[in-house]
Amino acid sequence: MKIAQELRAGSTIKIGNDPFVVLKAEYNKSGRNAAVVKFKMKNLISGNISDAVYKADDKMDDIKLDKVKAIYSYQNGDSYIFSNPETWEEIELKGEDLGDALNYLEEEMPLDVVYYESTAVAVELPTFVEREVTYTEPGLRGDTSGKVMKPARINTGFEVQVPLFVEQGEWIKIDTRTNEYVERVKK
């Protein structure tokens, strides 16, 4: 058991019979009222994202999820197939179970498959991935006041905001938790 104010992004809890992962936790204390914590959570069974508010001292059931190393193999319709590199067992997950992970999947990509009560419910990507910029508009010279960003499409088809100096064909590092550009990388 944990109290609500101890939970952070990435914590897993059980509400009713469903497991949830905390996407965002915001502590709020106003003058007269009791402290509260506002959560943005994802139901690991249904994939639904919901908002909830709890008193800071409410007790929550924290749960441990099992993780298994895997490699993304291929897509079959709406199913995505991963394989355990030790046993070569195939693990199948639906597209809606993968969420933002779909933006970064490439064949042979290592990741973790998350299990809840012996059922695969999600995947956990590496914190950072390196991807090639396949399309972006050229940056305009002189348009550099402040932190100016532009859209760039990476080799998986996902668009990410990058600084003006990033050009087509370059490789960039992206934070998979926030979907944000981190830096250019040499390949």
Curated annotation (Swiss-Prot):
Where does the record place it? Answer: Cytoplasm
Q: Which InterPro entries match?
A: Elong-fact-P_C, NA-bd_OB-fold, Rib_uL2_dom2, Transl_elong_fac_P/YeiP, Transl_elong_KOW-like, Transl_elong_P/YeiP_cen, Transl_elong_P/YeiP_CS, Transl_elongation_fac_P
Quote the pathway field: Protein biosynthesis; polypeptide chain elongation
- Record's keyword terms, sorted: Cytoplasm, Elongation factor, Protein biosynthesis
Instruction: Show the Pfam families listed in the entry.
Output: EFP (PF01132), EFP_N (PF08207), Elong-fact-P_C (PF09285)
Q: Which GO terms describe its biological process?
A: peptide biosynthetic process
A GO term from the CC aspect: cytoplasm
CDD domains in alphabetical order:
S1_EF-P_repeat_1 (cd04470), S1_EF-P_repeat_2 (cd05794)
Primary location recorded for the protein, binned into one broad class: cytoplasm
Provide the GO MF annotations for this entry.
translation elongation factor activity
Looking up PANTHER family in the UniProt record yields:
ELONGATION FACTOR P, ELONGATION FACTOR P (EF-P) FAMILY PROTEIN
Role, per record: Involved in peptide bond synthesis. Stimulates efficient translation and peptide-bond synthesis on native or reconstituted 70S ribosomes in vitro. Probably functions indirectly by altering the affinity of the ribosome for aminoacyl-tRNA, thus increasing their reactivity as acceptors for peptidyl transferase.
Family the entry assigns:
Belongs to the elongation factor P family.
Q: What is this protein called?
A: Elongation factor P
What species is given as this protein's source? Answer: Fusobacterium nucleatum subsp. nucleatum (strain ATCC 25586 / DSM 15643 / BCRC 10681 / CIP 101130 / JCM 8532 / KCTC 2640 / LMG 13131 / VPI 4355)
